């Protein structure tokens, strides 16, 4: 079935801050490691007529949406489908690299993708739908202990063991609604009522991270990506929860090729938070590629 690009509606976050921090070059080459619907790439391409972008995404629906959005600049952008951790630029070196992590609003808003408990759909959660493992596979085949560990480590869910025990007793679970109900029924009544978020929020986050191996691929990407930058080039990464942000922060500090630009993360303005609720948890960090001794002399 051909994806419908028009149905992939995603509002990019921290766009102004991202463009300012990249310090765009007139003839620069940029890597958008998570092109999504193409919002950030469109802004990069709009700055200068000779700027070029290589755009990656593992989600074919996102990639097709970006192709449609950026059609007028098709001579200045190349697309590649796959996870950013498996991309190889060859001899190319970039003036800037950006990544907007996590699940997009467009993915959450498409019921058939199975990311959200707001819709009744099959438990899927695959960003790359060609991969085998689904959320249903994890929920229905993993041991109680493994499920509890996933919920605790990836969702920071304090009732992880209680929830895992209930899930195992109720298996098989096939839909997002099935899972959300079981999670909600696992919590002590008073605790569930006092939560500011839906009782299943942390479990769904943890499950999505596990299905897509989000933290593992982020670590791999952030270790190799600095070698793709030209000296003076910048990498900017937007994260949406503390687990991602911690990885970005630590790797930026520890990588000898990088100098941290943002001592503290950049967050959305109050106006952007009002206009786009997804931006409330967004954190943007920048680092700059430092020249090696032989590069400084050349």
Swiss-Prot record:
Its EC number is 2.1.1.199. Keywords: Cytoplasm, Methyltransferase, rRNA processing, S-adenosyl-L-methionine, Transferase. The keyword rRNA processing applies. One of its GO terms (cellular component) is cytoplasm. It catalyses: cytidine(1402) in 16S rRNA + S-adenosyl-L-methionine = N(4)-methylcytidine(1402) in 16S rRNA + S-adenosyl-L-homocysteine + H(+). It is an enzyme of class 2 (transferase). GO terms for molecular function: rRNA (cytosine-N4-)-methyltransferase activity. GO terms for biological process: rRNA base methylation. It comes from the Bacteria. S-adenosyl-L-methionine binds at residues 38-40, 57, 84, 100, 107. Signal peptide: none annotated. It is found in: Cytoplasm. PANTHER family: 12S RRNA N4-METHYLCYTIDINE METHYLTRANSFERASE (PTHR11265:SF0), S-ADENOSYL-METHYLTRANSFERASE MRAW (PTHR11265). Specifically methylates the N4 position of cytidine in position 1402 (C1402) of 16S rRNA. Belongs to the methyltransferase superfamily. RsmH family. HAMAP family: 16SrRNA_methyltr_H. This is Ribosomal RNA small subunit methyltransferase H. It comes from Acaryochloris marina (strain MBIC 11017).
């Amino acid at each position: 079935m051909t994806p419908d690009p028009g149905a992939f509606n995603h509002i990019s976050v921290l766009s102004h801050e991202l463009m300012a921090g990249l310090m765009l070059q007139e003839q620069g080459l940029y890597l958008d490691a998570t092109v999504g619907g193409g919002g950030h790439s469109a802004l990069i391409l709009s700055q200068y007529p000779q700027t070029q972008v290589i755009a990656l995404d593992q989600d074919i629906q996102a990639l097709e949406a970006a192709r449609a959005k950026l059609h007028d600049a098709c001579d200045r952008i190349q697309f590649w489908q796959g996870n950013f951790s498996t991309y190889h630029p060859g001899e190319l070196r970039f003036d800037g690299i950006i990544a907007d992590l996590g699940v997009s609003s467009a993915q959450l808003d498409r019921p058939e993708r199975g990311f959200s408990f707001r819709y009744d759909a099959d438990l899927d959660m695959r960003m790359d739908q060609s991969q085998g493992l689904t959320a249903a596979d994890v929920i229905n085949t993993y041991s109680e202990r493994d499920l509890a560990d996933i919920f605790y480590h990836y969702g920071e869910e304090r009732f992880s063991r209680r929830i895992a025990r209930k899930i195992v007793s109720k298996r098989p679970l096939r839909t997002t609604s099935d899972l959300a109900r079981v999670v909600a029924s696992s919590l002590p009544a008073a605790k569930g009522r006092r939560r500011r978020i839906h009782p299943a929020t942390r479990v769904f986050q943890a499950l999505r991270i596990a299905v897509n191996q989000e933290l593992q691929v982020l670590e791999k990407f952030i270790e190799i990506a600095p070698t793709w930058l030209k000296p003076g080039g910048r990498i900017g990464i937007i994260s949406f929860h503390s687990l991602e942000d911690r990885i970005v922060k630590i790797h930026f500090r520890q990588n000898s090729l990088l100098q941290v630009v943002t001592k503290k993360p950049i967050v959305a303005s109050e106006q952007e938070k009002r206009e786009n609720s997804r931006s409330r948890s967004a954190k943007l960090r920048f680092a700059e590629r430092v020249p090696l001794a032989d590069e400084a002399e050349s």
